[in-house]
């Protein structure tokens, strides 16, 4: 209903226009992620709101589309979870209490595509982007997270942004992950690796990824 990956590949909603790209487009190799023993296309995430895509009733999603996710997410703002995690990634480590983590290879997630971090994503650079949101203690800190994210700040007191080909997560409790919007299991220990140029898609000749 939000078609994040189609948005990243700039595939039009029009069947006729998409058919034209399928016939006249060009091949583009895209990285994918390996999550322990399985794989995912563009996002692996856990924490607040990440179970909304598979917990929201399908009938509601069919009727309301992206709005269904927004409404379901709003109901949960007052009860943000907290996870104490250890994270290792290329050239860095992090340990602390967080409420949301996303490993991404997309310019659009949950229908959102206005942050500078996502705007500059390269789908076949061998790297995924990581956004880790530290748990706010009050409403002002939560507002600062949103403000700095929209400004494109890479890191700060509220969240961490990093690019890496490898991520390792350790938590004292089982974590419910979502992979591409579907339930991905609840391991305490997770290793994510980027698999370079693993899938080929047909995209429009004018896609900005082809200009780099």
Annotate the PLM regions.
Residues 1-67:
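Small-residue-rich beta-alpha loop regions that form the catalytic core of phosphotransfer
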Residues 89-90, 95, 120-125, 132-212:
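ATP/nucleoside-binding phosphotransfer catalytic cores, i.e., glycine-rich phosphate-binding loops
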Residues 60-67, 108-109, 119-137:
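Gly/Ser/Thr-rich active-site loops/lids in small-molecule metabolic enzymes
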Residues 38-45, 50-51, 94-105, 109-111, ...:
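Short hydrophobic-aromatic micro-motifs
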Residues 63-84:
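Histidine-centered catalytic micro-motifs used for acid/base chemistry in nuclease
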Residues 25-27, 78-80, 94, 114, ...:
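Short solvent-exposed loop/turn micro-motifs enriched in small/polar/acidic residues
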Residues 13-16, 66-71, 148-150, 173-174:
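Short Pro/Gly-enriched beta-strand edge/turn motifs at strand-loop
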Residues 78-127:
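Oxyanion-binding "anion nests"
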């Amino acid at each position: 209903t939000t078609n994040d990956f189609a948005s990243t590949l700039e595939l039009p909603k029009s069947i006729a226009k998409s058919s034209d790209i399928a016939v006249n487009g060009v091949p583009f190799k895209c990285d994918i992620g390996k999550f322990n023993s399985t794989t995912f296309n563009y996002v692996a995430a856990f924490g607040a709101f990440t179970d909304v895509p598979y917990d929201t009733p399908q009938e509601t999603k069919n009727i309301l589309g992206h709005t269904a996710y927004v409404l379901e997410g709003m109901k949960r703002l007052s009860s943000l979870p907290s996870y104490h995690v250890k994270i290792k990634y290329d050239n860095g480590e992090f340990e602390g209490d967080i409420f949301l983590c996303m490993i991404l290879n997309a310019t659009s997630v949950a229908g959102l595509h206005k942050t500078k971090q996502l705007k500059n994503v390269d789908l076949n650079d061998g790297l995924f982007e990581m956004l880790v949101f530290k748990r706010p203690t009050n409403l002002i800190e939560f507002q600062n997270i949103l403000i700095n994210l929209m400004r494109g700040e890479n890191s700060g007191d509220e969240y961490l942004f990093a690019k890496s080909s490898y991520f390792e997560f350790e938590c004292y409790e089982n974590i419910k992950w979502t992979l591409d919007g579907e339930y991905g299991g609840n391991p305490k220990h997770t290793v994510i690796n980027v698999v370079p140029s693993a899938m080929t898609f047909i995209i429009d000749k004018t896609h900005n990824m082809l200009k780099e």
